[in-house]
Amino acid sequence: MATQTIKQTSTSKGRQTSVGDILKPLNSEYGKVAPGWGTTVLMAVFMALFAVFLVIILELYNASVLLDGLAVSWQ
Protein backbone atom coordinates (compact mmCIF):
# COMPACT_ATOMS: atom_id res chain seq x y z
CA MET A 1 0.00 0.00 0.00
CA ALA A 2 1.49 3.28 -1.07
CA THR A 3 1.28 6.52 0.81
CA GLN A 4 0.82 9.72 -1.08
CA THR A 5 2.07 13.00 0.33
CA ILE A 6 0.46 16.14 -0.94
CA LYS A 7 2.29 19.38 -0.33
CA GLN A 8 -0.16 22.07 0.62
CA THR A 9 1.00 25.59 0.04
CA SER A 10 -0.81 28.70 1.05
CA THR A 11 -1.23 31.20 -1.74
CA SER A 12 -2.48 34.01 0.49
CA LYS A 13 0.11 36.31 1.99
CA GLY A 14 -2.19 37.55 4.70
CA ARG A 15 -3.94 40.83 5.16
CA GLN A 16 -1.95 44.05 5.11
CA THR A 17 -2.95 46.33 7.97
CA SER A 18 -1.95 49.81 9.05
CA VAL A 19 -0.56 48.42 12.32
CA GLY A 20 1.59 46.01 10.33
CA ASP A 21 2.86 48.87 8.18
CA ILE A 22 3.82 50.80 11.32
CA LEU A 23 5.59 47.82 12.93
CA LYS A 24 7.39 46.56 9.81
CA PRO A 25 10.45 48.87 10.17
CA LEU A 26 11.04 47.46 13.65
CA ASN A 27 11.51 44.01 12.14
CA SER A 28 13.66 45.11 9.20
CA GLU A 29 16.90 44.61 11.15
CA TYR A 30 16.06 41.01 12.07
CA GLY A 31 19.09 38.72 11.98
CA LYS A 32 21.67 41.49 11.80
CA VAL A 33 24.22 41.75 14.57
CA ALA A 34 25.77 45.07 15.50
CA PRO A 35 29.57 44.99 15.72
CA GLY A 36 31.19 45.33 19.10
CA TRP A 37 29.33 45.52 22.37
CA GLY A 38 26.37 47.43 20.96
CA THR A 39 23.89 48.34 23.69
CA THR A 40 25.20 45.82 26.23
CA VAL A 41 26.56 48.55 28.50
CA LEU A 42 23.22 50.38 28.47
CA MET A 43 21.43 47.14 29.31
CA ALA A 44 23.82 46.52 32.22
CA VAL A 45 23.16 50.01 33.59
CA PHE A 46 19.40 49.48 33.52
CA MET A 47 19.79 46.04 35.12
CA ALA A 48 21.83 47.60 37.93
CA LEU A 49 19.23 50.33 38.44
CA PHE A 50 16.49 47.72 38.54
CA ALA A 51 18.46 45.72 41.12
CA VAL A 52 18.78 48.85 43.28
CA PHE A 53 15.03 49.40 42.93
CA LEU A 54 14.34 45.84 44.05
CA VAL A 55 16.64 46.22 47.06
CA ILE A 56 14.84 49.43 48.07
CA ILE A 57 11.47 47.70 47.80
CA LEU A 58 12.76 44.75 49.84
CA GLU A 59 14.14 47.04 52.52
CA LEU A 60 10.84 48.91 52.75
CA TYR A 61 8.98 45.61 52.97
CA ASN A 62 11.24 44.45 55.78
CA ALA A 63 10.65 47.77 57.59
CA SER A 64 14.37 48.44 57.84
CA VAL A 65 14.38 51.79 56.01
CA LEU A 66 12.24 54.85 56.78
CA LEU A 67 9.96 52.80 59.03
CA ASP A 68 12.31 52.33 61.98
CA GLY A 69 10.32 54.67 64.22
CA LEU A 70 6.92 53.05 63.57
CA ALA A 71 5.54 50.27 65.72
CA VAL A 72 4.18 47.47 63.56
CA SER A 73 1.79 45.06 65.21
CA TRP A 74 -0.20 42.26 63.56
CA GLN A 75 -2.73 42.11 66.43
Swiss-Prot record:
Domain of life: Eukaryota
Bilayer topology annotation: Single-pass membrane protein
GO BP, sorted A to Z: photosynthesis; protein stabilization
GO cellular component: chloroplast thylakoid membrane; photosystem II
InterPro entries linked to this entry: PSII_PsbH (IPR001056), PSII_PsbH_sf (IPR036863)
Pfam families, alphabetized: PsbH
Chief location: plastid
Localisation per UniProt entry: Plastid, Chloroplast thylakoid membrane
Alphabetized UniProt keyword annotations: Chloroplast, Membrane, Phosphoprotein, Photosynthesis, Photosystem II, Plastid, Thylakoid, Transmembrane, Transmembrane helix
Gene Ontology MF terms in the entry: phosphate ion binding
Membrane spanning residue stretches: 41-61
Phosphothreonine PTM sites in chain numbering: T3, T5
Processing after translation: Phosphorylation is a light-dependent reaction catalyzed by a membrane-bound kinase; phosphorylation occurs on Thr residue(s) in the N-terminus of the protein.
Protein's job: One of the components of the core complex of photosystem II (PSII), required for its stability and/or assembly. PSII is a light-driven water:plastoquinone oxidoreductase that uses light energy to abstract electrons from H(2)O, generating O(2) and a proton gradient subsequently used for ATP formation. It consists of a core antenna complex that captures photons, and an electron transfer chain that converts photonic excitation into a charge separation.
Subunit structure: PSII is composed of 1 copy each of membrane proteins PsbA, PsbB, PsbC, PsbD, PsbE, PsbF, PsbH, PsbI, PsbJ, PsbK, PsbL, PsbM, PsbT, PsbX, PsbY, PsbZ, Psb30/Ycf12, at least 3 peripheral proteins of the oxygen-evolving complex and a large number of cofactors. It forms dimeric complexes.
Family of the protein in this entry: Belongs to the PsbH family.
NCBIfam families, per the entry: PRK02624.1
Record's protein name: Photosystem II reaction center protein H
Gene designation per UniProt: psbH
